[in-house]
Amino acid sequence: MKKIILTIIDGLGLRKERQGNAYLQAKHPCFDYLFSMCPNSVLQASGQYVGLPEGQIGNSEVGHLNIGAGRVVYTGLSLINKAIENNTFKDNEILNDVIDKTIKNNTTLHVMGLLSNGGVHSLDLHLFEILKLAHSKGLKNVSVHVFGDGRDVKPQSIKNSLETLKDLCQKFGYKISSISGRFYAMDRDSIFSRNQEAYDAILGQSKNVIENIDDYIESQYKKGIFDEFFEPAQLKDGVFVKNGDSIIFFNFRPDRARQLSHMFIGSNLYTYKPKNQVQIDNFVSLMKYEGINSKIAFKEMEVVNPLGKVLESNDIKQLRLAETQKYAHVTFFFDGGVDIEYKNENRILVDSLKVDSFADYPHMSAKEITDSLLNNIEKNDFIIMNYANPDMVGHTGNLNATIEAIEFLDSQFQRILEYVSLNHENVTWFITADHGNAEITEDENNKPATKHTTSPVMFICTDKNVNLGNGSLCDVAPTILDYLKINKPKEMTGKSLLK
């Protein structure tokens, strides 16, 4: 059986327009060769094609879920939205229970999360529905702690959501008590010093005490500090977390919610102990945060027989390879949102640089990823790997840095292509991406665009004897299994794109 390399480029979509398109403005001779000489097609990577609402931008979690599952996976955003649409959100047992207990104990319910309409980690609508539910049940003591986005949405976009939130809080008698940028509140690289600053603001122990949230946002903007990087601050008249209170974390995506959750209720994931630990009565997450013992409001779709399981069942040695920023995506998310290591599975984690902005280091750890691939390909049969550059640098909205990231990625692809060309009888290379981003780094006004896109993505195969049709991310696994002449499991509803 041929060895397979499945490379997932993070955040590189296909778009014809040149303006703001880092890919089209970059020099990429290896990509040019692959597109001109190898079978290739186009895959949909957003909206209903990946289990999201129509028109919703794709993201790394959803992209890897769909690729690994071989079917459309309906994720937290769709599940929660559907509950709101069919009017069952108000009947959610876990949400009602935490509200009832807060009323009974005469304590405070704190609702925290990313205030964004991006729909990648959270959706502002979910916060609003929680507040409406609490008010309908007569809960008077509710405090809201918001995190600025500016990454999956425009850098200065919090105000629209904030206006709606302020109106609801004024109507219901609730408080907005703290604000932090996601850079602090949602770190996922174990840089707990960042989380600690957000945690302090939520506990009312921040060094930054502000009178008015709108004035504070304007003051941050004047300093060139936008939503993602808001310095954590607490409102002078805020209501802060104390012993016996309860928390609802309304982010539905887990990877950037785990560290802050750990600080409130502990876990076996990390050893960090926060300063000024509080005892939380009830801690609720809208979806499951793997490794965090929260009460889960909405249960996710179970993925049976993802690609990794099929490889295990066929005694195929597999390697998962990524740098820190995307390691969870080629493991946890690729395996259907389950933390499992299969028989004959190897894993290599390449450390990501711990920097404030990857615009300053657009190469990231791409060279080390390639080194690891070439050093380990002989020991494995199926390599699932991720390059993070286009997405992580694209999120900065820095066009020149993103161009450099793509050009460096192209040089790494050249190294892989040389190996594959020399060993083409034994190795086939499949290339795709999980969603778009780097192809739109500037908007129509030449301002930085930092969010994901709805662009389709590439699907390339270096075996020139095949023909590829167009499809969606869920078709990648069935296609590769068909190529290997392995029957796909019945649960994989994606189709082979081999013609």
From Swiss-Prot:
Pfam families: iPGM_N, Metalloenzyme. It catalyses: (2R)-2-phosphoglycerate = (2R)-3-phosphoglycerate. One of its GO terms (biological process) is glucose catabolic process. The active site is at S60. Substrate binds at H121, R151, D152, R182, R188, R253, P254, D255, R256, K326. Mn(2+) 1 binds at D391, H395, H452. InterPro entries: Alkaline_phosphatase_core_sf (IPR017850), BPG-indep_PGM_N (IPR011258), Metalloenzyme (IPR006124), PGAM_B_sf (IPR036646), Pgm_bpd_ind (IPR005995). Binds 2 manganese ions per subunit. GO terms for cellular component: cytosol. Its EC number is 5.4.2.12. Mn(2+) 2 binds at D10, S60, D434, H435. It is an enzyme of class 5 (isomerase). Its cofactor is Mn(2+). Keywords: Glycolysis, Isomerase, Manganese, Metal-binding. One of its GO terms (molecular function) is phosphoglycerate mutase activity. Catalyzes the interconversion of 2-phosphoglycerate and 3-phosphoglycerate. HAMAP family: GpmI. Belongs to the BPG-independent phosphoglycerate mutase family. Monomer. This is 2,3-bisphosphoglycerate-independent phosphoglycerate mutase. It comes from Metamycoplasma hominis (strain ATCC 23114 / DSM 25592 / NBRC 14850 / NCTC 10111 / PG21).
